[in-house]
């Protein structure tokens, strides 16, 4: 098959949805997000859908499905599977109801949950199978690696099970990003970091700065093309040297859409430019297929 002269890859990201799947609940627009994603997939088959984490706790609905009815399949997992998410980051919220709850959610997901610094204590290998995933699009290799804020995990006082630990975010990021560049040689590297950026809080003390280490990750590594952040429930797009950094708010009220454009060389593709925009979902209708999928969940 003849290679295209140009390839555009659409990266769409959400953040901190906190199980707000009741339509009209706290401005949640996950059903409108579903419509937007469907629309973009009709326009371009090369869509990568990501979430920065924080989707399984933080609402009464989340409590119900974790504590009152843990035997039921979690509606957020059903929705994210149906929307064909490609990967999610991991936040401390995922551990709020215990490791067994989150492990079951992971097992029911048709996408990987990524964190390079949540590890087995004995081996220091990633606890959730793989810290990164590779998406190949017509010969263009996109690497996606996950990181969880160790400062946020410690601040929230979540008890880690005996068999796992949280490594320093910067230590793990250096280890795994170097490994990915040396072994996978990606054309574009995306980091999903469930933590924030300190420039949003000029009065941040040292403890808060250790929670939000996005700047340190960008400045100490310098080989990241797109950094997806979370936790702060803010919506923004910025740039630090070669790294585009974004955050997609909360509850799918908005999302961030990044267009990655490659042009063909003799035997490979070269990154041409990256476009980005914040998308307000209020103008989109709710996806009827997704509403039908959670009809009985929303009636519980």
What is the meaning of each model-derived region?
Residues 88, 298-300:
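Acidic, glycine-rich low-complexity/disordered segments
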Residues 290-298:
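Phosphate-proximal small/polar/acidic motifs at interfaces that engage nucleotide phosphates
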Residues 1-289:
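Acidic, metal/ion-coordinating pockets
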């Amino acid at each position: 098959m003849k290679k295209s002269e140009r390839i555009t890859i659409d990266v769409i990201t959400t953040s901190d949805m906190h199980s707000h799947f009741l339509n009209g609940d706290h401005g949640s627009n996950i059903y409108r997000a579903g419509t937007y994603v469907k629309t973009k997939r009709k326009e371009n088959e090369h869509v990568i859908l990501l979430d920065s984490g924080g989707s399984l706790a933080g609402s009464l609905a989340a409590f119900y499905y974790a504590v009152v009815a843990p035997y039921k399949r979690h509606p957020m997992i059903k929705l994210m599977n149906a929307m064909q998410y490609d990967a999610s980051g991991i936040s401390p919220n995922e551990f709020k109801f215990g490791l067994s709850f989150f492990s079951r959610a992971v097992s029911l997901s048709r996408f990987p949950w990524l964190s390079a610094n949540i590890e087995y204590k004995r081996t220091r290998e990633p606890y959730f199978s793989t810290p990164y995933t590779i998406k190949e699009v017509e010969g263009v290799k996109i690497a996606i690696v996950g990181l969880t804020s160790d400062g946020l995990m410690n601040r929230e006082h979540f008890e880690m099970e005996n068999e796992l630990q949280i490594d320093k975010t910067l230590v793990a990021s250096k280890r795994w990003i170097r490994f990915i560049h040396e072994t996978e040689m990606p054309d574009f590297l995306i980091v999903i970091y469930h933590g924030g950026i300190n420039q949003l809080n000029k009065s941040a003390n040292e403890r808060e700065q250790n929670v939000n280490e996005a700047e340190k990750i960008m400045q100490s590594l310098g080989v990241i093309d797109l950094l997806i952040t979370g936790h702060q429930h803010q919506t923004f797009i910025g740039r630090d040297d070669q790294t585009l950094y974004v955050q997609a708010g909360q509850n799918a009220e908005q999302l961030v859409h990044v267009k990655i454009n490659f042009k063909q060389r003799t035997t490979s593709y070269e990154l041409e430019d990256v476009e980005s925009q914040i998308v307000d979902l209020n103008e989109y209708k709710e996806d009827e297929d997704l509403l039908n999928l959670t009809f009985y969940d929303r009636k519980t």
